[in-house]
Amino acid sequence: VEWVSANPTGDLHCGHARNAAWGDSICRLLEKSGYDVLREFYVNDAGNQIVMLGESLISRYFEFFGKEYPLPENGYHAQDVKDIAADIAREDGDKWLTADASERLHYFMKQGIDRELAKIDRDLKLFRVNITSWMHETFFYENNMKRINDCLKMMDEKGLLYEKDGALWFKSTDYGDDKDRVLRKSDGTLSYLTPDIANHVYKMERGYPIMVNLWGADHHSYVTRMQAALTALGYPKGTLTVELIQMVRMVEDGVEVKMSKRTGNAITLRELCEDVGVDAARWFFVSKDITTQMDFDIKQASTKDYDNPVYYAQYAHSRMCSILRNPEIPQFHREDNYGRLTNEKELQLLKMIGEFPSTVAKAAKTYKPNTIAEYILSLVKLYHSYYNVVRVNNPDDPELTNQRLGLVMALKTTLRNALDLLGVDAPQSM
């Protein structure tokens, strides 16, 4: 599964957060279903944006020492760029003021990538997202672009390429694309598609026959050309699934909030976690289908009442835990028959517990973690209504009490497992 894959040029923002939560939950669902999942972040570190990052850092580095160095027209102005430049200045001193320009740019580009990725990894871990593979685009340019050239050779041998106007083209229209695509431009540089094809071929070579990518909705046209390339190379249909994620609007009291009140910049993933909590952020991002634009209600996500669905779900779990640790209720002992559970709500709850495995299987197969969120809300709504009308502890009927304790234990386990699939904690008390 390849997801997030934000450019290493700044902090993760709320759009990345939706991608991160959704993709991580897909990984959890697939792992729960028995798949060996590679959690991959594709690092776009070979494009012009990295040169702009390096030049921007140099400009801020010079500024730190009271010197002038022009900030590129398309450079990066964010505070984190200033912070990284200041860190380099404090660590290295002023030696880069008079260094060879090429060596200096290479150094600042590498420092920028490494430090930005370290922050991205830190923030993803805060968000309970664990990346196990960081695949750099520059990897495919190593050893005189061996992997890219091998890929182009394979395509050429299959008759998939032709030259026109000094450029190398892929016959992608033969495989469902609306026009043929340039792989190598007339000036000799590669298009973004070329190393990306090599990247996907390399995934297959590493033993991952199923690939799931999560991309922003603005990459819609890119899906067809990538699938065309894999089909042309002989990989089975369905090898690559691309989930397109629509945009997020942060709203408060019905009004869109575009900037952080603290920094005046776009709201970052870290700020969101600090403001509403990881549990609420994860829940809200995975509870709405990614095929539609979502409004993230900051105030609703921050409340500690039943209007907040994640609070509603977590409170059900804490209620279950409270019953099970109540010293006035006899300790549960396992039974072979639970025939005393005849209350209508008890039968409905038992049915829902039984449906959990198939719900997980469906969510994993369709890559739809919101299916689990919907299941959780149905389960806890039924449980809260049961809790309000049925006494678990009946001193005059220890057999019924014990069977109801068994039901509560099964509900607790099911709810905890369901919440974990979404990366949401299941607190024992609230």
Q: Can you name each region flagged by the protein language model?
A:
Residues 1-430:
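Non-catalytic interaction-recognition regions
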